[in-house]
């Protein structure tokens, strides 16, 4: 288990922003990482663009399209991370799809991710039953394969939690990523089941966009994950998005702190 991921949750409730690498450009992505860290982010999720991101709603899908048409490749993302690692040690995890890893070569991808300084990997389209081939290689190279747990049966939550590493990504609602007006899932109940099975941090994502929602979710867990709302700011402001994202992340981290 990556100690850096554990540390991200050791300072109180964590705020975890997500951005798509290369939207609007890899140079801006790099600047966003530094700005979000300054604004109080505890761990950063970096999305490696993929042509068919099944777990994503329209906002992140469009960001993937923009990044890919801008020429972003997995290798360019690795180079960017290596550059970021010269300036900051903030915990970072990749979020991408099995196909991105397969087409690069599973071991090659995971080894390279570890070499450039990533701490973990989230593969939303890989079900629990199929994670073994990735998990084994991740363990070999010291990368945490982060498990997602959606609203499901107590038994399944327990089964997934027992084998989880790093932190557990609790999915607040079934369906794709995006902003929701209301989150009705019993997050507190889900977190209790996870903690009963394993002593591991739980962060909640999918559908959080306002400070109020972030505070409410963090109150029932160890942190809040926000993607679409940040990606929307990148889409709206393009090359000038950094100060807007920084201000937003600060407001979200402040809310999470109060939880």
Q: Predicted segments — roles?
A:
Residues 41-52, 118-122, 127, 172-179, ...:
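Glycine-rich phosphate-binding active-site loops on the catalytic face of alpha/beta enzymes
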Residues 77, 192-200, 209-215, 219-259:
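Alpha/beta catalytic cores of nucleotide-metabolism and tRNA/nucleoside-modifying enzymes
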